Amino acid sequence: MKVRDLLPVELWNNFEDLNAVPRPSKKEERVIEFIKNFGLNLGLPTYVDPCGNVIIKKPASKGSENQKTVIIQSHLDMVHQKNADTEFDFLTQGIQSYIDGDWVTAKGTTLGADNGMGVATIMTLLASSTIQHPSIEALFTIDEETGMTGAFELEKGILEGEILLNLDTEDDDEFSIGCAGGIDTNTSKLYKEEKISGGIGFEIIVKGLKGGHSGMDIHLERGNANKIMNRILALALSYNLKISQIDGGSLRNAIPRESVAKIVVDSKDFLNQLDDLAAEIKSEFFKSEPDLIIEVNNIDSITHGLSNIDSIEVVNAIYSVFNGVYKMSQSIDGLVETSSSLARVILNGGSFITQSLQRSSLESSKQDIAKTIGASFLNIGADVEHSGSYPGWAPNTDSEILDIMVSLYKNMFNSDPKVQACHAGLECGILNERYPGLDMISFGPTIKNPHSPDEKVNIASVQKFWSLFVEVLKVIPFKN
């Protein structure tokens, strides 16, 4: 069976059509055109705002004209991650998906189910002539994964809906009614390289980690390639370490899976000590990271790098950076309140750069952890920039659409849904600032390992999610 044969057929075919269009964050030109043409070909009012968001409006079905207008929202962009041994160009190639047991996944890359399943769901609704629904305002935003630019720059006054259904939650028995805000902390310092003569050159590679979403997966105690690499570099300090290059992590909102460093030390005894350290690190992560690999290669071509003194400073700075769960919520059991992820560590030509992302459902705690991270680099004279701050979404337990969907879920599936906030940056908080008073909820099919090449979406959950989506459109409340 092929992906296009799965049920509901229309939804899966729209997903495959979407995945044939390259759509990495900040490179959404082709998918914007694709969605715009999709709406125009259906004869529906279609508008692309100056930022690149696409809005398609569909009149209510006969008999549903007096129901409240519903905004249905998903983001067009996807995280572009691939395995080190996968040859793939996200700018020119479509995602190659396939069925793996109960799941759909991709060949060596992210699948794009985040948030492609949401986009495909909206497309299926827009194209349907049989689904009963109120007036629909389909909102396709851009650049959610690298700054939520589309949500931030969405024009005011072009949407009239009172209810917003966000389709970016990744568990089919969960309703999200709140989310974390976030802020980026970027640091830089330029060192003067020195000529390296003598010593022994090595390339150190940390790979095989699971990675994942630095918000939703931060509590799973997965390894951070940048922090693991730094432990190796710290060991090398005893052998007159001189760092030439570091390239760790890839995306600001993904847990780093790989890191590569080129270094010079003054003794091969370092290798014996590294074997012991590698064994210790693997034992620490034996359950959460069973495929962790620490690889060492001899190289003779290292001619320039940092001095030993500057190498010590870099290692100590990275060591001092907090990474992981900072604080758990005191109001919702099991919810991460505040966290930080050291996403990128780069050293090249003497330029030392880090990128990290702090998240919190509390604005005060978000600012606190961001300043904590920044202080680690201010102490070495680095430039520190905090940017891209976006608000969280405060839960509303009195939400009308929440009550409707909880009741509907119980009747359809004979069980209670999980109602909770998530430790990730949904666009709902920003959209609520642009359009105050929206009654919002987020739901979706079950997606595992988003933001990594292990991303997969559960087939049965897609059908479950779709059936719930169709039914809720029938029971949207009437206008006041």
Model-derived features with residue positions:
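Zn-dependent metallopeptidase/amidohydrolase metal-coordination segment
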Residues: P8-L11, Q330, E337-F352, L357, ...
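His/Asp/Glu-rich mid-to-C-terminal helical/loop segments that flank catalytic regions of hydrolases
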Residues: K156-G157, R222-Y239, K268-F270, D310-Y319, ...
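Acidic/His- and Gly-rich active-site-bordering loop/insert found
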Residues: K2-D102
